[in-house]
Each structure stands twice: as C-alpha cells, then as structure tokens.
Amino acid sequence: MIKVGSKNVQLSNISVMLIDPDKELSTLIRSVLKSLGFSTIHVARDGTAALNILHAHNVDLIITDWMMSPMDGINFVQKVRRDKDSPNPMVPVIMLTAQAKRWNVEYARDTGMTEFMVKPFTAKQLCAKITRVIESPRTFIVSPQYIGPDRRRKTEPYDADSGERRCVHDEAAIAKYSKDKLHLGQKEHEVFLVDRDFSLKEKIGKSVNLDDIFSEANVRLAQKIIYEAKGDFLHWFANDLKQLEESHHHFTEHHETQAAKMQMAQASLRIKGRAGTFGYNLASQVADALHDVIVQLHGEHDKIAQVIRKHMDAMYVILQQDIAGDGGDIGTALIASLGDLTKKYLH
C-alpha cells in the first residue's frame, strides 16, 4: 500500500496474475508490483497452470509472457477470450515479452491482448501500461472472428478509403451489452459491443489519480528493486550461455534441429529481456540478433551453426569483460560484424 498525501491507496484491491517461465525475472517483476502496492499476485510458469489459477481465484489483471510450454501466451489468451467456461473473458491482459517484431504485436493484438510491452522493460513502462488498462479501458468486441478489446484506438470516424482494416456491413447485427450480460455463445454473425469496464478504477477509488500512485518517487523506488538485482544478472547470463552451449552442441553434433532450435530461441530471448532490463544493452542486441538467426535458419546446417557460434562467442566476451551499456564504438563494430557475417552465410 502506497500513501499519497493523507490517503491510503488500495492497489491491493486489484488481484494480479503473472505468467512467465523465467523464474528469476518473474520473481523480480513480482517484487516490483509489490513495491507499487499490489498484494495479491498469483504466479504461473505457463498457460495451463495459469488457466487453473484463473478458474480457482478472482483475477483482475494478467501480465503474461509469450514463449512458454506446454501452453504459450497466445494460446492462453485465446482460451481466456473464447472458451465458453472462461471465468472472466474480459480480463485485461498485458503481454510482456521479448518478441518485439511488428508481426508479434499485430498477432497478439488480433488474439485479444489488451496491451503489449517489450522486454527489456523499466518500472516506468510497466506503470504506464497498468495506468492505461485502469484509466482508459476500451469497448470490448465479441464477434465470430474476434473477441477482445476494440483494436481501433482512433477517435475519428471510420474511413473506408483510408486502408484501415475494418470491415463494416450494414446487415451486421450490432448490439450494446454491459459486462454482466455478456455471453460468449452469441449467434452467428452477431457482433456485441460491451461497454467500457471501469471496475478496476472503482476498486482503487474513482477519485484516485494513478499519476499520484505511480509518482516519480514511487516509480524510482520500484526501479531501484531492478537495479539491486543487477548483481545477479551475470550469474543468470552465465547459466543461459551454458544452456545455449548445450543446445548448440546437439544442433551441431547430433542434428537434433527442432528441439535445439526451440531451446536456443528461448535462451536468446531470455538473455535479450534480462540483459536490457539490467542495462547490458549490447548483450541484449546480440541476443536479439541471435534469435533472428535461429528462427530464420535459411542456409546450410554447418554455416548456420557457425553463425550461431559467433554470436555466442560475442556474448562470452561481454560476460567475461562485464561490458554494460552499448559497448561504445566496440559494440557498434561488433553488431555490424555479426550482421555482415549473417548476410554472408545465410539467405
């Protein structure tokens, strides 16, 4: 609970569920949320476990990663939005992931995600997303093709000639519903527009200004928790590189391509998110470039293995020399050389 002036602001009235396979990072995010005033925080490692929690507990806000198994964040959101036995199909979902390509954002949006946030992250960015969910909820759409918050944030009228991907049919049956009257088993072709849900705002108090709760001082305290965990990062980094080494060995020596690809992709995204969050921007950039190489995988197997190895060697140097920040001119040259190598060997 954070004190604002003479008031006790009850962010503890909002129940949060955090879904992330990264145990260390999810523990850190949980600590940040606690410092901001949230007290009920359920934690799950994948979508399957999260669904069990959602059915057993009241959850007001979900923060989820994308890459998880056996059920990833996208499939989880689909089930929350579309399953007829979903306990809360309108629950706000913030996707916090290292998957940062444009198509990732669009795909998550079209699945029914409420807000999208990229790892690495700061406490200030997290507060901004939470504020948007609470203060500016959107009309909820229920249709045969899509269930989720209105994807159109524009306030001006729809213009059919603008190239906007919205399909409007005069014959479509559009009805306005309130949240308590929403049913997912609507008839074919019916479109329901559900009124904006301000229940989270009501839980903390309609007169409360979130800018006061997430003040510069309070956000600074939350960010301090992240800074204090920075000392653990190099240990986590070393463990991630060890996993990359093992997966690369299987990829190179045993040609266990699919399993090794998945493991290396997960490790590279984990490094990207962790490294950038703790100020190791060069390591984050190299890990991001490595992930691109892994998921593209166009070229001869041995050449792909060589390019992956060069990216790993670069990260070993960053770890051994404890290179924080972007590495200056050396970092710029390193990123450029890895890019040139990738273009040379892969297509």
Protein language model features and the residues they cover:
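Helix N-cap/capping motif at the beta->alpha junctions
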Residues: 43-52, 73
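Active-site beta3 strand of CheY-like receiver
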Residues: 57-64
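Receiver (REC) domain active-site loop signature in two-component systems and cognate sites
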Residues: 68
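Alpha4 helix (beta4-alpha4-beta5 surface) of REC/receiver domains from two-component response regulators
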Residues: 30-31, 75, 89, 100-115, ...
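C-terminal output helix
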Residues: 121-134, 142
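CheY-like receiver
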Residues: 9, 135-210
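Two-component/phosphorelay signaling modules centered on CheY-like receiver
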Residues: 23-45
